[in-house]
Amino acid sequence: MAIITLPYRYLERLAGTDRQTIIDRVPMIGADIERIEDDHVDVEFFPNRPDLYSPEGVARAMRGFLGIEEGLPAYTVRPSGIAFSVDPGLADIRPFLGSAVIRNVNLDEEAIESLMALQEALHWAVGRGRGKVAIGVHDLDTVTPPFRYIASPRNRSFVPLDFEREMTMEEMLADHPKGRDYAHLVENFDTFPLIVDAENRVLSFPPIINGELTRVTAATKNILLDCTGTDRRAVMTAVNIICTALIEAGATVETVTVEGEEMPTLAPAERVVSVAECSRLLGLSLTPQEMAGLLRRMRFDAEPDGDSRVRILVPCYRSDILHDWDIFEDVAIAYGIENFDAALPATSTVAQEHPIPAVAGAVRSVMTGLGYLEAIPFTLTNERVLYANMQREPAPGTLRLLHPISEEQTVVRTDLLPLLMEMLLANKHRELPQRLFAVGDVVEDCVTYLKVAAVSIHPAADFSEAYAAADVLCRELSLSYTVVESADPAFLDGRRGDIVVDGKIVGVFGEIHPAVLGAFDLEHPVAALALDLTAVPGYPALPDTP
């Protein structure tokens, strides 16, 4: 979770209240206070509220929560006349660009630190370590529009931020601290993303580093914001959060034309929610008027829509609002978590551990004892990772998303091993050996069950290592098994084995096939195993598949 530093003097001015009130009430909007210092307080917010990752965002929320200023913040934008073009050659690298012009900023040292902290927090929470989104903030008055986002030769040179000499982009990946940290995001591409102005001067090498030319200082009055990435929704989330935070600080926002699209609009989204459903979930008896009033304190526009519904406008910066229940959570916060009456459950039972988490816990104990580090892959993935890269045929029972928002997340995972291979790719710049395991749900034929997978990558990884780990795991799980030669194409012929229990293949282990290593751009051998945990004694029987 992100820890945000909130300077008292700045926050008091923006929030319109005193520091003690802020300290007393900020935990009620979903924060944990980490440290209280003489001039600031450090507060930890959950990753689902990146709009609170700045003093400006916290002040906006506190004004509503305390009843100082309720309802939807009024944001207006006007056209800047500035245009941005996007090179089609970036389609497979970082295809999406979001931008805005922010004028009349007042950047003292404290405000610059706040802006940079917001940028880095968004890189973590929204950008997934700059993989999905990278943010650039530039002094607009040092460059000349229009701007171009291009696929550049790798030997293009410019002066990177905090350096005094020109370097090629390849040199930056090796010698610049940010280059070393994020080289893995671009180093495998033939060309690199680059942002240049009308005079072909470099503003930024996303997602690595800005140019020294556009450094933001206390003298900066007008900012050009760029957000590049692989996920359009995440890119625009970052744009909206930064723009609205700076508006709270007194700036004005102007749109930029990106490939014919004016952005940002900062327009709210409309929803209609049920009062009865909210009341049932929260154990309250709310009227539409009461519910609308509570939502206005959470900075929504809300009005009763008949006798049973409330029509609301959701601020553009609230990227966490995905479902009606997210709205109901805000109703509970505005009502006051401390105002809910504690009640004992209606029934009393004797508890015991469910067998499925018991099996998962046993697996974790064994694998960590073998020196493996647990990873938690995403539940959603795509068929390229699951099947094509692994040289496997698609499983007929794969559950596909009807309306995926990203090409990277189109199906629910049916296996964990491909996702661990993807994690090895993401960490190939880290030192070896790396040993990872994952235990979690997979879905086939609309049935959810538990699997485990493990990988070990280093120059000496081999069949014996995978066999030894599989043997220890099966014995510790009380599995009576035999091993037969496997035909799994993800593994190397002659160095692979199937785990058989009661005549059924329930797992596989061995050395990953070189073609699979190549598909994941891995340069060292990988020993791996995978096991279906429904074979473990005591695992509940699965329902019949449709």
From Swiss-Prot:
Cofactor(s), names only, from the UniProt record: Mg(2+)
SMART domains listed in its UniProt record: B3_4, B5
An example molecular function term from Gene Ontology annotations: RNA binding
Recorded catalytic activity of this chain's protein: tRNA(Phe) + L-phenylalanine + ATP = L-phenylalanyl-tRNA(Phe) + AMP + diphosphate + H(+)
Coiled-coil ranges (or none): none
Gene Ontology CC terms, in alphabetical order: phenylalanine-tRNA ligase complex
Keyword Metal-binding tagged: yes
Official protein name in the record: Phenylalanine--tRNA ligase beta subunit
Organism: Methanoculleus marisnigri (strain ATCC 35101 / DSM 1498 / JR1)
